[in-house]
Structures are given as structure tokens and as C-alpha cells.
Amino acid sequence: MVATNLSYDHKPDSERERKRIEGGGGYVAPSRMPGVGFVGPARVWDRTRMFGLATSRSMGDTVYVGPNRSGVIAEPEVTSHRLDANDRYVIFGTDGVWDHVTSQEAVEIARRHPNPQKASEAIAQCARERWRRNGPMQDDITAVVVGLA
């Protein structure tokens, strides 16, 4: 069973999103700490440089949305995929999952757990374990497996 990605991460450092952000009046850079330099992931900054947002699309961060602000938009990416007899699952996950679990790994985990609830829990647990190995920080982790059979 092979994973098929139905979306891409809306992160400021992807070339596609960075160009769109810069065209919308924002710019992309990590946070800067005095005496330390740049830290953390790339962020979207508006002209005031008061806040940096680590995602390039958002429906709730309205301070970033609007003309000549930051280039952050609330417009979703919509894709389609024609199902065939080999498709078994749709797996949704937050960036806390996808930062540490590949799409193919998620498919393999789901295949080992026929119950969608158990598969969802196993994918989330895998992500949590990998976050813990990388230090004390952990992002939000949510996984949902929908069975198509």
C-alpha cells in the first residue's frame, strides 16, 4: 500500500508559500533572540514585525490577514483524488503528526490497526514518542483515520 499525499504543508519556508507571502506584503524569517541569533522555524512577519506566525495560511489569526499586511491568507487549498479499489484510508493529521511521521509510515501504522480509532491513536502515539526524543517541546498532535472499505 503506497501513500498518496492530498495536500502539502502550508509552511512559510516552502518556496511556493514564501513567494506568495512576499507578494502579499509580508516576509519570512525565523525569530531572532538578542545575543543568540535566529531561532526556531521560519515565520511570517507583517510590516510591524511584532508577531511571527509559523504557518502561512490561517482561519483564526486575523491580525495577519488583509491588504498589505503579511501575506497570510485564510483560503484553503482544495484538491481532489479519484478513489480506486486500492484506496483503504484517508488519514488526517496536524503538523505535530507530519513533522515526525511520514505519510507512508502513517499508512503502514493504519494497515496494522484495522480499527480506525486504534489506528488514529497509534499514529498520534508514534508522533508523541518522536517529539519526546527531540526534546521537551511538543506541538499539537491529532490524527484521524477514516476507513474507506
Can you describe what each PLM-predicted range is?
Residues 1-149:
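PP2C/PPM-type serine/threonine phosphatase catalytic core
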